[in-house]
UniProtKB/Swiss-Prot annotation:
Its EC number is 3.6.4.-. Residues 183-253 are annotated as: Small ATPAse domain (RuvB-S). Transmembrane segments: none annotated. ATP binds at I21, R22, G63, K66, T67, T68, E129, D130, Y131, R172, Y182, R219. DNA binds at R311, R316. This is Holliday junction branch migration complex subunit RuvB. InterPro entries: AAA+_ATPase, AAA_lid_4, DNA_helicase_Holl-junc_RuvB, P-loop_NTPase, RuvB-like_N, RuvB_C, WH-like_DNA-bd_sf, WH_DNA-bd_sf. GO terms for cellular component: cytoplasm; Holliday junction resolvase complex.
Amino acid sequence: MRIEALNTAPDATEARFEEQIRPQKMGDFAGQKKLIDNLKVFITAARKRGEALDHVLLSGPPGLGKTTLAHIIAAEMGGSIKITSGPLIDKAGNLAGLLTSMKKGDILFIDEIHRLAPAVEEYLYSAMEDYRIDILLDSGPASRAVQLKLEPFTLVGATTRAGLLTSPLRARFGINSRLDYYNPELLQSIIIRAAGILNIGIDEDAAMEIARRSRGTPRIANRLLRRARDFAQVAGDASISLAVARRTLESLEIDEGGLDDMDKKILEAIVRKFNGGPVGLASLAVSVGEEQDTIEEVYEPYLIQMGYLSRTPRGRVATRLAMSRFAHPGISSQGSLFDTAEDG
């Protein structure tokens, strides 16, 4: 059975839950202290000058709070927020419709901004830099360009793959911030707060047990909390105890390091099938039956963070930690005799 408890992509139910528990002010946002402190300064200064906040780029693994921060920025600036994503804006005309509806101080949040089409991205340059866009009227020989002025707005872009952003787009963001994984103590406080909103009690040690297995990601921590609530309620328990938390995590096949079934498949494939690597992404994806993008964006960041995996120019390589844990007895942990070339 494939377990999806550690997938960092939100489903519709989860999106509604995140809306319910989302912090409304900078002071309520847990973690990312340096980033938050800097944003407070930038927002306060922009408000004192009566100006729109500089455009903000938020990067980092999924599920760490980029969308939440965009909402908080809009609230702190006293503007409205319009939400879209890179793949949804497939034509410059779609972007023009969004931009012309913005009022002074509004926030345009583009998730997965690295997936903007090149033509749409170029159309965004003048909007970000000069608050203007050029619209082409009619077609053929009678066509003419009309320049439209825009109200000063703030673009907040979110990306899990900052390296895919073009230099011209990246250069137009005045504020560039990266979100990092959370430590267990911060996740514990997030879990306890969310449990209060869900009207279910949770023991501190139970919250810490869930936190330790949440891959440093609030979205996963909140998802595991909801599953633990299910186990507690079915068992007739009024609150989530340590025993309930452990039973939940064991049932979801999440080990003490936060690794799930697919994490283990990836590491076992590299260690056992490819003798530790290097192995190309395409070969690895076929081996474990998962999409390349999912491996690269969802699974690899945490495996690298935890010291199980390295990316090299020739492919993915298992570290000594991974070799010692996942190698069959008798297999060397020194790496491959024959290197596998990178193919993705």
